């Protein structure tokens, strides 16, 4: 199974996850890591921890972000390398 991590600025990720749950129900191997201003200092560590945990239980991990070139995208790319 492939794991999915949804991340983005502000309430983008939790809001989209809520819509997905309403339409498709709870999904296995799916987690949300929001990037909010008051948690900016720990965001990279939080995302890395989520990816590491997902790798332990899944065959692969896809990280979905809101903006190409934004902090969530850039952090995910740095972790992937």
PLM regions with names:
Residues 1-81:
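N-terminal loops that bind phosphate or other acidic moieties
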């Amino acid at each position: 199974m492939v794991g999915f991590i949804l991340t983005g600025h502000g309430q983008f990720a939790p809001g989209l996850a809520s819509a997905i749950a309403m339409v498709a129900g709870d999904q296995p191997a799916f987690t949300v890591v929001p990037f909010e201003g008051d948690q900016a200092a720990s965001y990279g560590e939080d995302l890395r921890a989520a990816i590491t945990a997902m790798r332990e239980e899944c065959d692969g991990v896809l990280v979905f972000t809101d903006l190409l070139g934004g902090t969530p995208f850039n952090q995910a790319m740095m972790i992937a390398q």
